[in-house]
C-alpha cells in the first residue's frame, strides 16, 4: 500500500521507553525464524530518533532514519562539522534468526567491551530490600551470592544522601555520599567484605538525574532542565540535569570518578536513567534551545568517553529502568 509510517520518540533522556531504535522488514512475505529475506536496522544514537518508511507510487520503499528533527533545528558556525549518527543494518536470506545472530556477532566483536569473553553473574539487592537495608543485611546477601556461586554483589538504589537520606525515590538523588545511618562504615566496608568472600562489588548510580528535595537541587537549580514559567513535572519524583552544560558534564563524570578514587575495588557500575526530559529548557543554552536534545546526548557521550579513558577496564551497564536507552 502507498503511504508513510513513522516510528519515533521525543522523550530525550529515556528515549526508548515506548519504542526501540530498531526495525525489521520482511521483503518476500511474512518472515520466519529460518526462512525469508529480512532487512534489520538500528541507529547508533541514544536520544530522540525517527524512522520513516514510505512506499511510493512505483511500490518502492524508502527508509529514512536519523535524529528526530522535532524541536532540534541546529545552527552551525562556518566550517563546523555536524556528524549524524551511524546507521547499522544487516541482511538475511535465511530468516530473522540469522539477522539477529549477525547483529549479536557484530556487537560482540566491535561494540561491547570484551564482547567475546564470559560475562559476570551478579546478585542485586533491589527486590530483596528495596530502600530498607543496612550493612548487616547487605553482608548477609553477599553470603547468599557466594552460596549461589555468582561473581558479584551489586548494591542498588538507596545507599546515598544525608541531609535528605534516600529512604525512597522522593529525595536524595544527586547527593552521592553514603547515608551515615545505613552505612556508617562507608562503601569501603562493603567492598572489603565482598573481597574477603571472594566476590566482586558493583554499585548503582543515576548521575544524570536529581530530586528537587536534594542538596544538589538547592545549590544548582540552574543545572536542571525545566521551563521557568511552568510547574515542574516529575517522573519518578525526579528531573533531568542539563548535560549540554560542561559544568554538569564535569559533575556527572565526578560521580564515577570520586567513587573510583575513594573505592578502587568497585568493579561495576549500574548506570540508571529513569526519567524522560519534561518541560524542556536549558538555562545554559540561552537562545539556542533547539540544540538541547542533541547537545544532551553529546554531553553524555563526552562523559562516557572520559570515564572510558580514565578507567578503560571498568564495565558499566546503562540500564534506564531496563531497556529504556541504547
Locations of the language-model features?
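Structured core elements
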Residues: 75, 83, 122, 152-154, ...
Amino acid at each position: 500500500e502507498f503511504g508513510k509510517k513513522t516510528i519515533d520518540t521525543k522523550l530525550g533522556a529515556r528515549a526508548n521507553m515506548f519504542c526501540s531504535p530498531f526495525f525489521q522488514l520482511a521483503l518476500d512475505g511474512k518472515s520466519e525464524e529460518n526462512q525469508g529475506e529480512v532487512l534489520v536496522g538500528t541507529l547508533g544514537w541514544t536520544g530522540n530518533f525517527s524512522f520513516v518508511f514510505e512506499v511510493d507510487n512505483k511500490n518502492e520503499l524508502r527508509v529514512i532514519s536519523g535524529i528526530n528533527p522535532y524541536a532540534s533545528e541546529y545552527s552551525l558556525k562556518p566550517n563546523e562539522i555536524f556528524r549524524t549518527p551511524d546507521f547499522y543494518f544487516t541482511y538475511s536470506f535465511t530468516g530473522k534468526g540469522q539477522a539477529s545472530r549477525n547483529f549479536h556477532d557484530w556487537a560482540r566483536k566491535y561494540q561491547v567491551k570484551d564482547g567475546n569473553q564470559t560475562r559476570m553473574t551478579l546478585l542485586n539487592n533491589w527486590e530483596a530490600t528495596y530502600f530498607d537495608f543496612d550493612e548487616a543485611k547487605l553482608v548477609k546477601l553477599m553470603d547468599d551470592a557466594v552460596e549461589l556461586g555468582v561473581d558479584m554483589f551489586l548494591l542498588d538504589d538507596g545507599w546515598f544522601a544525608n541531609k535528605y537520606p534516600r529512604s525512597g525515590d522522593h529525595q536524595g538523588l544527586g547527593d552521592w555520599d553514603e547515608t551515615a545511618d545505613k552505612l556508617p562504615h562507608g562503601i569501603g566496608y562493603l567492598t572489603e567484605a565482598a573481597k574477603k568472600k571472594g566476590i566482586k562489588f558493583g554499585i548503582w548510580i543515576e548521575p544524570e538525574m536529581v530530586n528537587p528535595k536534594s542538596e544538589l537541587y538547592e545549590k544548582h537549580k540552574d543545572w536542571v532542565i525545566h521551563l521557568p514559567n511552568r510547574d515542574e513535572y516529575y517522573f519518578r519524583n525526579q528531573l533531568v540535569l542539563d548535560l549540554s552544560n560542561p559544568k554538569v558534564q564535569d559533575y556527572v563524570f565526578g560521580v564515577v570518578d570520586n567513587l573510583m578514587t575513594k573505592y578502587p575495588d568497585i568493579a561495576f557500575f549500574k548506570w540508571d536513567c529513569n526519567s524522560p526530559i519534561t518541560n524542556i529548557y536549558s538555562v545554559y543554552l540561552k537562545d539556542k534551545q533547539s540544540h538541547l536534545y542533541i547537545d544532551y546526548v553529546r554531553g553524555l557521550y563526552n562523559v562516557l568517553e572520559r570515564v572510558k579513558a580514565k578507567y578503560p577496564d571498568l564495565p558499566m551497564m546503562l540500564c534506564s529502568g531496563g531497556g529504556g536507552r541504547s
